[in-house]
């Protein structure tokens, strides 16, 4: 273990605190009476009154017998004024001269008791009367500075380091915490919208014997007791439909899904999807519901239906345009691909510069055409509708064109945000669609769907006409917070393995420090330096 000079000094301070009889990690509950935000927003209510706060010490300015510090709790930051003789009313000034001035460090978690007042310059502050150490910080925090123009410069701006050590990122970068607070507002808004309509929130299995409901590569594991392979779910769709078969009229779930595929700025192998299924509805009804839902989410999280996403101002105000996918492809490529066979589609793909191979069927090639040539052009919310049957094995056949299905995807800022259907409830048709997927799998398509015989059995008992939708929560949060990477809206995104420093032989100084930690024995910093 290699320690920096500052880390060694902090460990020495830890020992000195213990020698003074101060437990740096007390177990007893510390009862607070207010938060910083409550005091700042209701100063008149708290003025002149005694309060108890707890938080992290973020700065310290020592000015002889008086000092200033900044305390940060979960709600905000506030100045603490420390007068030596008010903190230490007896002749013993240890708490000020030794503990506060020398042994406490930036990042330490403390409890403070004092009166609320305003300084001569009008800053709301606490006049400290009692100080309690609640947790000693052994690593120094990165230093964050604001220049004269108000620009923030911090020593913790490396993206990879921020994602790995999100706990530090949250401490020093207040705007990061705001992103995750807004994420909760977004999911709360969705829950309120559904719960007000009587929809039931449910939970379905994460470990599944068959990974169904989407075209994606699953993660595979093994159950030792049952001696069977299991898969981390790629979607929860088929289980939610089983609940519709069972008699629920409307169910939804915020599900953690997993896909063993690539990682980029919009994809993480573990992600959150909200799926909703409502009986006796179709995809036209679902489009209207989606517009109403996203209007509410935008207003609740941003106070307006207009949201800045990168360079674009996007309006979530209904209604949204509806564009059939084959019309979109014709508009952006000049080719009418409706009715084309595999050979003809392959020729079109080659003409527009899209690589194809023999494993790709009609659905896959149409998906590639739209994704490469059309998707990025839809900045404002747009429903792309009426997908070919080959692309949608779980979707009901279109009521006026048997070659198409009643499916839509919602595009926002050039990306897919939601996917929805009039759900296929014909068990015979569903079995045939699964068998077509099996043929694609045999051709080498590793994203083709598995055949789920139990789901077919459930449909044979009868599922009412149903519409369902899946909304990518991580991507929705990216849009509503104007975040450019999915890693910015996940507390702990998946990362490549951290590079470890090469192992080194401990020197005498480090061995002595290791002994302190292992035996909890006191040793002076000067003794360490003597080594």
Feature annotation, model-predicted:
Residues 499-513:
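Short alpha-helical segments that sit at the start of domains
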Residues 9, 508-512, 523:
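Alpha-helix N-cap/N′ positions at the starts of helices
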Residues 518-524:
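Short capping segments at the starts of secondary-structure elements
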Residues 1-503, 524-525, 529-531:
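Class II aminoacyl-tRNA synthetase catalytic cores and aaRS-like
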């Amino acid at each position: 273990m290699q320690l920096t000079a500052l880390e060694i000094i902090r460990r020495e301070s830890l020992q000195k605190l213990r020698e003074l009889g101060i437990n740096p990690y007390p177990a007893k509950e510390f009862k607070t009476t207010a938060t910083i935000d409550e005091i700042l927003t209701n100063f008149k209510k708290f003025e002149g009154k005694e309060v108890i706060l707890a938080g992290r010490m973020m700065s310290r300015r020592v000015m002889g017998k008086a000092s200033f510090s900044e305390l940060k709790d979960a709600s905000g930051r506030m100045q603490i004024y420390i007068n030596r003789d008010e903190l230490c009313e007896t002749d013993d000034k240890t708490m000020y001269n030794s503990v506060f001035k020398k042994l406490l460090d930036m990042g330490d978690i403390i409890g403070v008791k004092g009166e609320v007042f305003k300084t001569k310059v009008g800053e709301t502050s606490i006049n400290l009367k009692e100080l309690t150490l609640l947790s000693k910080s052994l690593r120094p925090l990165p230093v964050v500075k604001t220049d004269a123009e108000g620009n923030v410069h911090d020593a913790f701006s490396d993206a990879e380091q921020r994602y790995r050590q999100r706990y530090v990122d949250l401490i020093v970068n207040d705007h990061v915490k705001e992103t995750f607070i807004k994420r909760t507002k977004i999911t709360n808004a969705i829950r309120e919208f559904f719960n007000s309509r009587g929809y039931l929130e449910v939970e379905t299995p994460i470990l599944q014997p068959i990974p169904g409901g989407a075209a994606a590569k699953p993660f595979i594991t093994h159950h030792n007791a049952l001696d069977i392979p299991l898969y981390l779910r790629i979607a929860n769709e088929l289980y939610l439909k089983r609940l519709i078969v069972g008699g629920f009229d409307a169910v939804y779930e915020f599900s953690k899904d997993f896909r063993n595929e690539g990682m980029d700025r919009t994809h993480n192998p573990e992600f959150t999807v909200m799926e909703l299924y409502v009986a006796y509805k179709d995809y036209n009804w679902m489009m209207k519901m989606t517009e109403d839902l996203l209007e509410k989410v935008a207003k609740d999280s941003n106070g307006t239906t207009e949201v800045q996403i990168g360079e674009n101002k996007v309006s979530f105000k209904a209604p949204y345009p509806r564009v059939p996918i084959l019309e979109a492809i014709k508009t952006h490529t000049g080719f009418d691909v409706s009715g084309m066979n595999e050979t003809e589609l392959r020729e079109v793909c080659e003409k527009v510069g899209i690589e194809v191979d023999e494993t790709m069927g009609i659905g896959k090639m149409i998906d590639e055409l739209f994704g490469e040539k059309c998707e990025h052009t839809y900045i404002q919310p747009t429903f792309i509708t009426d997908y070919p049957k080959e692309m949608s094995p779980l979707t009901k056949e279109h009521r006026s064109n048997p070659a198409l299905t009643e499916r839509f995807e919602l595009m926002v800022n050039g990306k897919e945000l939601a996917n929805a259907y009039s759900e296929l409830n014909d068990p015979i048709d569903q079995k045939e669609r699964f068998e077509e997927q099996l043929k694609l799998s045999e051709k080498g398509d590793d994203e083709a769907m598995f055949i789920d015989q139990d789901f077919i059995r459930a449909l044979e008992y009868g599922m009412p006409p149903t519409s369902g939708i899946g909304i990518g929560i991580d991507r929705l949060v990216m849009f509503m917070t104007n975040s450019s990477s999915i890693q910015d809206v996940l507390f702990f995104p998946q990362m490549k393995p951290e590079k470890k420093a090469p192992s080194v032989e401990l020197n005498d100084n480090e061995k002595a420090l290791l002994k302190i930690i292992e035996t909890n024995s006191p040793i002076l910093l000067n003794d360490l330096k003597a080594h």
